[in-house]
């Protein structure tokens, strides 16, 4: 059988139809999932290239396979570009995901049973920062810090107290649902007092850090991890950065052969393309627009009477606290989805509701900003979200209002470009 003369439509009509329908879905909804974005056609082209055929265990010039001359060039380009982007001395672009980037740092710096101090999941932390169901929560002695019960801001005094008490081997800064800036310098002060390692997980705010719109952790953290999608607008994957090249060598060994085998060279090439795009002046303008749009979205919801956690946002995330409204996050997210607005249910700090139900929703602006939305558009989006939430407060059957908002979404989204 000659596989080289058949395209996807000819080979697998079912998958081809799924992709077509997913393209239609992505093009026709207002995407407010904070961890999602739209990559450029150039990134898609690299990711779908024949580099997927090449095995390349090891690192450039130190491979376990022959024939790696071209993929070595691609990986070196990705490394040099991302080092320039974040102004750092070391980068590893091989992690398959942000979770595996975090695991590689743990494997490099920790032993099973070591104490780790990270943000609790319900306060906005990530599964891989020590949550009980995750490997990090099973292998290490985890102590969690939370946000202030009144302001919902990071409580640096509590972190310092817990660090003094428990003497962690590793302190983690980072989040999956926290709308304010992080003081990485303060984290480093705490770390130095107790002799710990400091890891900053910037998966959500990497684009803000790269463009100077958020304090960089590079001068302070022993290791910095990130995803390469979200605000970096690249392929789904992971990344590890550092200014400590000795720690970098430990991380290299931890990732391969410790954690992964062959890297995904088509993904690494796509990362390189995204990093090149991120080095262009217009990328900084994009990130600034992401932040401005998030502020507009938060303000429009506040105007309609909804509680925005911490009273606003410094980044791309808007967390809506629905406790006083008597609506669950799951109920709200499902109704919004039917109205053509995708987001996710999200726990609120000190939330007593099940994590499968939650008391809030998380909204984000990166994806629609990529499509060209400005502040005025996000004000309209905020009003649409509020309309749906208002309807849920009055009537569990929100179908008529969902259809009305869906019509408004369809009218608005057609004004903005998508893949041809």
Swiss-Prot record:
Designated gene of the protein: glyA
Organism, scientific name: Rickettsia massiliae (strain Mtu5)
Subunit structure: Homodimer.
Modified-residue entries (N6-(pyridoxal phosphate)lysine), positions: 230
Reaction equation(s) it catalyzes: (6R)-5,10-methylene-5,6,7,8-tetrahydrofolate + glycine + H2O = (6S)-5,6,7,8-tetrahydrofolate + L-serine
BP terms from Gene Ontology: glycine biosynthetic process from serine; tetrahydrofolate interconversion
Function: Catalyzes the reversible interconversion of serine and glycine with tetrahydrofolate (THF) serving as the one-carbon carrier. This reaction serves as the major source of one-carbon groups required for the biosynthesis of purines, thymidylate, methionine, and other important biomolecules. Also exhibits THF-independent aldolase activity toward beta-hydroxyamino acids, producing glycine and aldehydes, via a retro-aldol mechanism.
Key words, A-Z: Amino-acid biosynthesis, Cytoplasm, One-carbon metabolism, Pyridoxal phosphate, Transferase
Protein name per Swiss-Prot or TrEMBL: Serine hydroxymethyltransferase
Subcellular location field: Cytoplasm
């Amino acid at each position: 059988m000659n596989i080289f003369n058949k395209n996807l439509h000819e080979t697998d009509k079912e998958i081809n139809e799924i992709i077509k329908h997913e393209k239609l879905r992505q093009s026709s909804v207002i995407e407010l999932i904070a961890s999602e974005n739209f990559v450029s056609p150039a990134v898609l082209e690299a990711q779908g290239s024949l580099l997927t055929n090449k095995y390349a265990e090891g690192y450039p010039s130190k491979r376990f396979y022959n024939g790696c001359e071209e993929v070595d060039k691609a990986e070196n380009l990705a490394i040099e570009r991302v080092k320039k982007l974040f102004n750092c001395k070391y980068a590893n672009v091989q992690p398959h995901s942000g979770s595996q980037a975090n695991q590689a740092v743990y494997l490099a710096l920790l032993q099973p049973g070591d104490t780790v101090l990270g943000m609790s999941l319900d306060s906005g932390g990530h599964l891989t920062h020590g949550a009980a169901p995750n490997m990090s929560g099973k292998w290490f002695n985890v102590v969690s810090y939370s946000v202030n019960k009144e302001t919902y801001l990071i409580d640096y005094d509590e972190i310092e107290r817990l660090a003094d008490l428990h003497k962690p081997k590793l302190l983690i800064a980072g989040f999956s649902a926290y709308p304010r800036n992080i003081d990485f310098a303060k984290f480093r002060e705490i770390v130095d007092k107790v002799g710990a390692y400091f890891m900053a997980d910037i998966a959500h705010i990497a684009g803000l850090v790269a463009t100077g719109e958020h304090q960089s952790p590079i001068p302070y953290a022993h290791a910095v991890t990130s995803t390469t999608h979200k605000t970096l607008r690249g392929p789904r994957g992971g990344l590890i950065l550092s200014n400590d090249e000795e720690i970098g060598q430990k991380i290299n060994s931890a990732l391969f052969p410790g954690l992964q085998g062959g890297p995904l060279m088509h993904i690494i090439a796509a990362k390189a393309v995204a990093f090149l795009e991120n080095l262009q002046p217009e990328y900084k303008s994009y990130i600034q627009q992401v932040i401005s749009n998030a502020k507009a979205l938060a303000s429009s919801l506040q105007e309609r009477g909804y509680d925005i956690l911490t009273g606003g946002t410094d980044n791309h995330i808007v967390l809506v606290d629905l406790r006083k409204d008597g609506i669950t996050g799951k109920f709200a997210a499902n109704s919004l989805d039917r109205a053509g607005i995708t987001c996710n249910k999200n726990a609120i700090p000190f939330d007593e509701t099940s994590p499968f139900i939650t008391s809030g929703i998380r909204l984000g602006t990166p994806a629609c900003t990529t499509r060209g939305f400005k502040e005025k558009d996000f004000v309209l989006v905020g009003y649409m979200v509020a309309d749906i939430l208002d309807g849920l407060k009055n009537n569990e059957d929100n179908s008529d209002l969902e259809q009305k908002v869906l019509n408004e979404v369809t009218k608005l989204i057609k004004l903005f470009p998508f893949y041809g």
